[in-house]
Amino acid sequence: MRKKVLATLVPLALAAAYGTGALAQEAAEAPAAPAAPAAAAASGDVAANVDAANTVVVTGFRSSLQKALNLKAQAIGVRDSIVAEDIGKFPESNVAESLQRVPGIILNRDESSAEGQRISIRGLPTEYSVTTLNGAPVNTTSTGSIGSAARGFNYDVFASELFGRVDFYKSPLSELPEGGMGGVVDLQSPRPFDNPKGAVRYSVTGAYNTMSEKTDPAAFGLFSKTWGNWGFLVGAAHSKAMNNRSGFEATGGYNSSARGSKTPVQGNFAMQLDYDDPRANLSGYTRDQVDNALLPRIYRFYGSSNDRSRDGLVSSLQYKDSTLNVSLDTMYSKLKNSRDELYYGILIRNSKTTNPSAPPGTAGHNGLVPIDVHIDPGSNLLTGTFGNTSYSSGVTYSEDETKFSYASLNANWKANDRLSLTGQLSVNSSKAQSYQDTLSGQIFGITSTIDYGSDHVYPSLSSTSDYLNPANYSGFGIGTGLTRETDRGRQGRVIADWDYNLWGEWTGHLKTGLVYVETEKGVHKRNATSDMTTKLNGLGNAGMRQGMVFDLPISNLDMGGGWPHQFGTFTRDYTYSTFDPLAYNTEATFTPAQSFTATEKVTSGFVQSDFKGEVLGHGLRINAGVRYSRTELDIDNFKKTGAGGAYEPNQESGSYHNLLPAISGAFDVTDDLMWRASFGKTISRASLSIIAAQTVVPNPFDNSATAGNPSLRPQQSKNMDTSLEWYFRKGSLLSAAYFRKVLTDATVSSTTQTTFGALGLPDTAMGAIFYGPDGRVDPNLPMTLRTYSNAGRQVLKGYELSYQQDFDFLPAPYKGFGMLASYTHIDPFNSAKWITNAGREIEVNSVPKYAYSTTAYYENGPLAIRFSYNYKGRSLHGDNPKNNGDDLIRWRAARGYLDGNISYKINDNLELRLDALNLSNTLSYDYFEDATGQYGSGKKTRMDYAKYDGRTIKIGLRGKL
C-alpha cells in the first residue's frame, strides 16, 4: 500500500517542480542581448497541440511546465528549459536541483551542505559543460572544489531567485560558445520589461535541519517597475543553513595483511598484522584466513557541522522602444561556509611491527595484534579484539568564501523588419578563498574491541583505556593550508540577424557574429604547517593537553549507541586562537608546485541559418552553420630546474584553432509528432589544473598525488542526436531520444604506485596524519600518482525517455493532477579497463549507467502539492579508476532523493509554502566490491564515507505587493 501511495505522489511532484520553473510567467521577451541559446529557437509554427496550449491562460506549476514545453517545441535543436513561475519565483532554491529533472543531467551534491553543486551531462564529467550568464561564459567555484582549477561551474554560489529562466542545449549550434562537449547551460537574469506592469515580490522562510536541529532564516525581495520606455529592477536574497553529517569512514580503502605487507604494496595502503606478539590468537581460524581478511584503512567515526550563508543581488536598468532595447545588468553573490569536522578512531594504515622494543603503538611497533577476532562471510575482519591499536582524535576547522560579480551592457537595434543588430560587453569575476587547520592527538598501543554491527554506519568501539584522561594523549600534530582561486572574464560580441525569403513558402533566418572571450584563472596556495609545527613542539605534550576538551565541540551529532560520546579533542576557538590559519598562512611561503596563472584568449566567428518550410505538406525546420575559433593560452607557473630541484618561474604558451560545423533539423511527421536530428562537432578544453600545475597532492589527507601535463590537446567530439517527440495532448509530451558521441583526444588518467620520497615534495604537502614522531613524512610512504594524457577514440552513447502530462481530462476533484518523468541510460563508458589480478576484464562505468527523475503534482484552486524523486545508479569512484592489486572495485553507491512541497494561496497576493528536502534521509556512501566474486559486493560490509545528511523542512510566506 505504501508503495502505491508513493507511486501516486511521486509523479505528481515532478511536474510541479518543473512547473514552478516554467509556468506562471508570460512568454519571456527576448532579452536586450539575447543569450546565445535563446536565439536558437526558430520562429514559426510548432506542433498543433503546443500552439493550442498558448491560447489557454493558466498559472502556477501547470503554466510553468507549458512554457518550458513551448520553448522545447519551438527549438530546432535539442533544448530543454526551466522558466520561473513568476519573476523571482524559481522552482527550487538551487538551480542545479531544478536541472536534474532534465533528461541526461546528473546532479553532483556538495558534501558539506548537501546542496546541488555541479552537473554532469550524458556521462561526461562536470568540466565538459559550459555555463553562460545571459550568453556570456562564466566560471566560479566553491567549498571543496576551491583550488581544483576545474572548468566546471558551481551553481550553489547563487540563489535561484536571481534568475528568470534556464535554457539547456544538448545538441551543438554554431552560435553557442565552444567548450561544451556535454552541453551548454544558459542562465538568464530578469529584466524590468519581462513584466512591464511592474512587480514587488518577497519571501521569508525558516529552515529546520533534523541533523543539526537548528532553524535558519532566508529572505528574498525584488522590485521591478517601468516608466514609459525606461525600467529598473533590483532584487536581493539572503539565506543561512546549518547542516550536520555523521557516519563511518574507512578513508579510502580496505586491505589485507597478506597484500599490505608485500613490497611493493598491493592495494592502496600498507599494513601488517603482528602474529609474533604473545597475545596473538587466531580464534580458530588459519593464519591464511586471518592474513587475507580485510580491514579498513582507518576505522573511525566522522561528524561535521557546516554553517552556510549566501547573499545575492541582481539589478537591471533597461530602455526599450519599438526599435531599440538596451540594458545594463549586474549580479553579485557571496557564499560563505564555516565547517567544523571531527574524527575519532583506530589508525590501521601503515601499521607494522619491525622493532618490538619501541614504545607500543608508535612507528616501528604499531602492528595490530589479533586477539579475539571474527571473519564475516565477506572475508572482513571487522569484529573482534585487537592489541596494540593506536587512536587518532582530530578536528578540522575550515573557512571558505566565494565572491562573484558580473556586469553586462547589452543592446539590440531593430534596423528594419528584417535586420537587427545585437551587441554585448560583459565582465565577470569570481574570487574564492579557503583555509583550514587540522589538529590531532593520539593514544598509542592500547587494546580495543570493534564491532561493525548490523548498521555499519554507526559501528561500535571500546577499550580499557580512559578516553577522558588527557595524560593518555600524545603524538600531537598540526596541518594547515590556504588556497585562493580567481576567475576573471571579459567578453564582447556583435551579432547580426537577418530574415529573408527563399523559394515558394520557404523562409530563412541568417545569424552571424564575432565573439571575443578572455579568461584568466589563478591558483595561489600557501602552507604554514612547518611554522605551526614549530609552535606545537614548543608547547609540548603538556601544553597541548591543557588545550583539550572532552565534551564534543559539535552538538547534536548522531553517533549511534556503540561509539564513545566523549573523548579528547579541541574546540574551534582554541585551534584558531593558538594556530591562526589566516595569519600563519598569509605569512608563509607560497607553494610553487600548486600555484599558477593561466590566460585564455578565444576569438570566434560563426555563421548559421535557419530554414523553414514544408515538404509534402509537413513542416520542416533546419539550422545549419559553422563556427571557427582560435585559442591562445599563456601560462605562468613554477618548474623544477637544476640539480637541486628548486622551483623557478616558468612561462609557457600555445595556440590552436578549431572549425566546428553543426546542423539540426525538426520535422513535423504529423500535427503532434515531431522528429529531430542533429549532427555537429564540439570541443572541450582540459582542466587548467592538469595543464598548468606541477606535481601536487590535491587532498593532504589522502596519499595520492597528481602530475600536470602542459602538452594536453583539446578534446573533440562528433555528436549525433535523434529523437521523436509526441505532443499528444495540451501540456503533454512523450519522447524518446538517442545520442552518440565519438570522442578523440579525450583526457584520461592513469595511476602508478610510488613513494612520497620519489615525488620530491615537501613534508607540508601531506596532512598531519602522515607525520611521524619526528614531524616528518616517511619517504617510503606509498603514494598513488595520477598522470594525464590524451586517449585515442572512444564512443559514448545512450538514450533518454521523457514523459509529461497534465491530467486535466479527469473529472473534479482529480483534474488538478499532473506528472513529469524522465529516464537516462548511458552505456558503460570508462577510459581505462578494470583488470583483475587474474587478468579478467570487468565492465565498469565511470558515471551512473542510468538515472531517473519523477515528479507528481496536484494543483486545484489555492492548493498545490508536489513530490519529486531523483535517482542515479552507482558509478566508479574517480580516486580508484583501476585495480591497485587488491581486486577491489570502489563504487559510489546508487542513491535517490525524495523532496516535496505544499503551498496554499491565502489570497491573490500571499502564499503559504512548506518545502521538505531529502525526505528519504538518503545515506550517501562508497563501497568496495570484490571483483573476483568470492567475497561479495561489499555494499553493506565494506562501506566508506557512509553519512546521513538529515531532512530539511522549510516553511515560509511568498507574496507580492
Q: What annotation goes with each model-predicted range?
A:
Residues L176, P192-G198, G228-W230, T323, ...:
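Short loop/turn motifs that connect adjacent beta-strands in outer-membrane beta-barrel proteins
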Residues S145-F153, E161-F168, E175-L273, D307-G312, ...:
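Outer-membrane beta-barrel translocator/receptor signature
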